[in-house]
């Protein structure tokens, strides 16, 4: 029933991991690793492939979501009779929601593999996409497709649901991740039926459900009876654009926000791959620009007893993490960190836009043999429409007027 074909193609690696076979390959595939000092130089093709995939930076949303999911999974492991508490990751487009979901799924998959043993036949994690205009039966078919559950044309929705619930419980699925949840519209009859069907599955499948979608609280998903039930059972994590600066309080000298002097990203294991988290060695390695690769860049103010306010720069920290992971031969360390205000203007603090900008700039630098990322090179790259609408360089009117006024001839 569950396919176990080890042969992976490039097309498979590029596809969304919405079947168990594809998700297992995604989770087991080692994440990209930044070059280490003393390593032999990589070839052009190797470096192009590396920057295409690139490291994943552990943003605050990734760290918080992982902790929440692990807590909910422990809370609901032995719960019976009622639906387990769930979680919704929401935010604007290109803020790393899907990457956050996949990184959490990868981490939970690897943790369960260690706990149960590599030879175990369990399927701990399921990842599904809500199809556009989803009906209840379409959702049921997506659940069946993930595990390769046989479905015939004559089967009713109730029969498919019964087969799905039995298989998911018997094979040990503990975490169900549903992406693009904003596509459900309970205000329509089909959308309401799909929302009710999803609620029914949360009560029949012994797993923790985590959803991700665009600005979910502003959609119809939280309205009506079904929406109220979902909102009453699901916690919310906002995956917002990264601010240029933020303040957090501290009560003890030498302590960070985690309370023990470590960056919050040090509390979790390795991760990698994608546009949202700095996994692997890049999360703890200290860069040559003076900031650690997980972005431990903060300024403290307050009294002599250690209490006060810590000024943190989450966006600058993320830029530092990505810059420290570059594999370019002539790039000047710290140059992108100094451009952090400009990069924040270009991307509006959206992690997806930032990742695409730096990955494209790195690949261009390899192809044109400049081997470095500069401000002019970044200016030459057109980003997604959202980012370009946000960033409109303003030329001072006086300078523009001078440029358009012909020079006077001397007599």
Regions found by a protein language model. Give the residues of each.
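Mid-core helix/loop region of P-loop NTP-binding domains shared across ATPases and GTPases
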Residues: 27-43, 135-142, 151-208, 250-251, ...
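Post-Walker A helix-loop "phosphate-sensing" segment adjacent to the P-loop in P-loop NTPases
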Residues: 107-118, 149-151
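C-terminal alpha-helical "lid" subdomain
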Residues: 2-36, 40, 249-411
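Hydrophobic positions on the alpha1 helix immediately C-terminal to the Walker A/P-loop
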Residues: 100, 104
